[in-house]
Amino acid sequence: TNANVYVIVNEGEVFQIDSGLKSSFNAIRKFYSENSLRPNYVLITHAHVDHIGALAEVYRYYKPKIFAHGLDLKVIRGEERMPNRSFLMRLFGAFIKAEPVREADEIINKNFKNIEVIETPGHTPGSVSYLYNDGKERYLFVGDAAFERKGKLFVNRTFSLDLKTAEESLNKIIGLKPVTILPGHGNPVKLEQ
């Protein structure tokens, strides 16, 4: 299914988290048009097609700076395929592909005001989360490092490449409370202290 796409307006700059499937682009463009915005940056949580499928369209239309973890960059750039543990992922990947975006760059050691990059591998080798602090609340955009169902967070065992590392990343995420978790699929989950 399609992934959630988030937008942060931070210090006058627009940060988009992930891009969803290619079919998401019209909704993304409509959102920006209706809100008189355009993305300065696209921060990718990981390189699965449901999170990067519309990335090439977003890049062509808006020319934002694109960042992802180095371990997933070769997939985004079209230089490698994402390894797949499950038959479902191989099947999904055979039918739905993302157009390469060669302009993507490494996120690690990149500094953005109020946004911290947190490595949360396991779902993919280069999975990262983005912790945004607006001065009042903390929000963690986790991609697929945590899935939400009925208000609970869990690791998706079918689509995660390294289950042990994914569980460790989920524990790291939970350890960041108080924070509102914004997953790639499902609804936000507020973790109290």
Where are the regions a protein language model picked out?
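Pre-active-site segment of Zn-dependent metallo-hydrolases
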Residues: 11-43, 88-104
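Short amphipathic alpha-helical segments
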Residues: 28-30, 55-57, 80-81, 133, ...
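Residue-level marker for buried hydrophobic side chains located in beta-strands
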Residues: 15-17, 43, 66, 139-141, ...
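Conserved beta-strand hairpin/beta-sheet module of binuclear metal-dependent hydrolase folds
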Residues: 1-34, 129-143
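Metallo-beta-lactamase
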Residues: 22, 72-119, 125-192
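Active-site metal-binding motif and surrounding structural segment of the metallo-beta-lactamase
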Residues: 24-72, 179-180
